[in-house]
Design a protein with these regions (language model features):
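Conserved alpha/beta core of the MobA/IspD/sugar-nucleotide pyrophosphorylase nucleotidyltransferase superfamily
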Residues: 1, 184, 188-236
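N-terminal glycine-rich phosphate-binding loop and ensuing alpha1 helix
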Residues: 1-50
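Short aromatic/basic micro-patch
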Residues: 20, 101, 176-177, 208, ...
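Short, structured coil segments at secondary-structure junctions
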Residues: 39, 58-60, 202
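Acidic helix N-cap motif at the loop->helix transition within catalytic regions
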Residues: 51-57
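Conserved donor nucleotide-binding strand/loop of the catalytic core
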Residues: 59-73
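Conserved beta-loop-beta/alpha segment of the NTase-like Rossmann-fold superfamily
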Residues: 69-122, 134-137, 141, 148-188
Length: 236
């Protein structure tokens, strides 16, 4: 698992990843969640921030600090380092450092979906086990219905309404788990591109796992968004 924590926080006005979220730095939520998933062989944080670097070190979490300007370079740096530590890595999940409402069970479901596809590539429509797939399949970007042995698994949220007629809105986002078949593409992304570039090249292998709540996909760009997410946790 690689945690991307290189955002400059320009809209936030300061280092958002170290901003207080229920008494701890914002990034702590993702560190805590990813640390509770036993399916990960290792974790690595990639950041530009000395504060984030020092905080991760204080927790014993592997961290790389860099001054690279572009997303593709930071992603390449992280994946290269992870492959040096684990040359036989079968896949890698990329998470964002500013998604504080991400849940451990959701990460586990992403990993298990990946493993299902690796073991049985014809394992079909359990992507939406609790939803009306007949509606959903017409609304999401579509794969062939058959996961190949080199899957990409992406988190999405689905919101359904019953009136005046059934409808659904979907959002796709992070985390994303890539099979090692796509590592070379991730290591050679176009300038300023991220992992979504690889998704667009292989839409037929992407599998979707639904978030337990839509807010899991929300990241933080402004102090107002941080406050809103804090309030959501308080309500829950």
């Amino acid at each position: 698992c690689i945690i991307m924590a290189s955002g400059l926080g320009k809209r936030f006005g300061s280092n958002k990843l170290m901003a207080s979220f229920h008494g701890a730095p914002l990034i702590h939520s993702v560190l805590d969640v990813t640390g509770s998933v036993p399916l990960f062989a290792d974790r690595l944080v990639v950041t530009r921030s000395r504060e984030v670097h020092d905080y991760c070190q204080s927790l014993g979490i592997p961290v790389l600090i860099h001054t690279l300007p572009n997303r593709n370079e930071a992603l390449c740096l992280g994946l290269t380092h992870m492959l040096k530590r684990h040359p036989d890595l079968s896949g890698c999940l990329f998470a964002l450092g500013d998604q504080p409402l991400l849940r451990p069970r959701t990460l586990e479901r992403i990993c298990r979906r990946y493993l299902e596809c690796k073991i049985s590539p014809r394992h079909s429509e359990s992507v939406f086990p609790d939803s009306d797939f007949s509606i959903l399949k017409s609304k999401l970007p579509q794969n062939s219905g058959i996961a190949e042995k080199s899957p990409i698994v992406q988190l999405c949220s689905v919101q359904m309404t019953a009136s005046p007629e059934p409808s659904v809105s979907t959002t796709v986002g992070s985390p994303i788990l890539f099979d090692r078949a796509y590592f070379d593409e991730l290591l050679h992304l176009p300038e300023k591109a991220g992992g979504s570039h690889v998704l667009r090249q292989h839409p037929d292998v992407v599998q979707y796992v639904t978030a337990e709540v839509p807010e899991e996909l929300m990241d933080v760009d402004t102090p107002e968004e941080l406050k809103r997410l804090e309030n959501l946790v308080t309500i829950e």
